From Swiss-Prot:
It comes from Arabidopsis thaliana (Mouse-ear cress). This is Ras-related protein RABA1i. Keywords: Cell membrane, GTP-binding, Lipoprotein, Membrane, Nucleotide-binding, Prenylation, Protein transport, Transport. CDD domains: Rab11_like. NCBIfam families: small_GTP (TIGR00231). Belongs to the small GTPase superfamily. Rab family. It is found in: Cell membrane. SMART domains: RAB, RAN, RAS, RHO. SUPFAM superfamilies: P-loop containing nucleoside triphosphate hydrolases. Intracellular vesicle trafficking and protein transport.
Length: 218
């Protein structure tokens, strides 16, 4: 249902970024979603890389351009360019390493400093399959997400649990906001937003108003 399509066969192009500490599984989340692949020998990402995948929202094809960068301090110089134009983000921590959750607040600040105030953000607790090593409760993370007005989901890139759901939910929310704004303006969403054009997701009220289950299919 629209999972893997021709490169130019899409109605919308949304830039989504992955952020969070090094070693939390960002690269494996990306490879699991875009290639259904998982690497047990996943080294820290050097520089920046991105991958794409298209999904279907209503009768439209939404192409996600998902960017991945290492969470290590020495790559901080690329942040401005990395975040520029992003309309969605997955902020990832490792449920077995509390320090990665403690750093979420700093990553969130950096994300908001470098993007539009209304970017759609999903807090992601990865490595949920390591139940016996869990250091952050679901309740603690959920409370943080509610306080910061972000979405929240726990995933396992290893077991392919909730990975598609996390990415699809972010894309769904972006699509809904963009469609709603185009309709309010009296425009056809597709013609109003040519391929490759920067998407402005509008006011925060729009974001909070559409926090409902996703409508898109992977």
């Amino acid at each position: 249902m629209g999972a893997y399509r021709a490169e130019d066969d899409y109605d919308y192009l949304f830039k989504v970024v992955l952020t969070g500490d090094s070693g939390v599984g960002k690269s494996n989340l990306l490879s699991r979603f875009t290639r259904n692949d998982f690497s047990h020998d996943s080294r820290a990402t050097i520089g920046v890389e991105f991958a794409t995948r298209s999904i279907q929202c209503d009768d439209k094809i939404v192409k996600a351009q998902i960017w991945d960068t290492a969470g290590q301090e020495r790559y901080r110089a690329i942040t401005s360019a990395y975040y520029r134009g992003a309309v969605g983000a997955l902020l990832v921590y490792d449920v077995t390493r509390h320090v990665t959750f403690e750093n979420v607040e700093r990553w969130l600040k950096e994300l908001r400093d470098h993007t539009d105030a209304n970017i759609v953000i999903m807090l992601v607790g990865n490595k949920a399959d390591l139940r016996h090593l869990r250091a952050i409760s679901t309740e603690e993370a959920k409370a943080f997400a509610e306080r910061e007005n972000t979405f929240f989901m726990e995933t396992s890139a290893l077991e392919a649990v909730n990975v598609d759901n996390a990415f699809t939910e972010v894309l769904t929310q972006i699509y809904r906001v963009v469609s709603k704004k185009a309709l309010e303006a009296g425009d056809d969403p597709t013609t109003a937003l040519p391929k490759g054009q920067m998407i402005n997701v509008g006011g925060r009220d729009d974001i909070s108003a559409v926090k409902k289950p996703g409508c898109c299919s992977a």
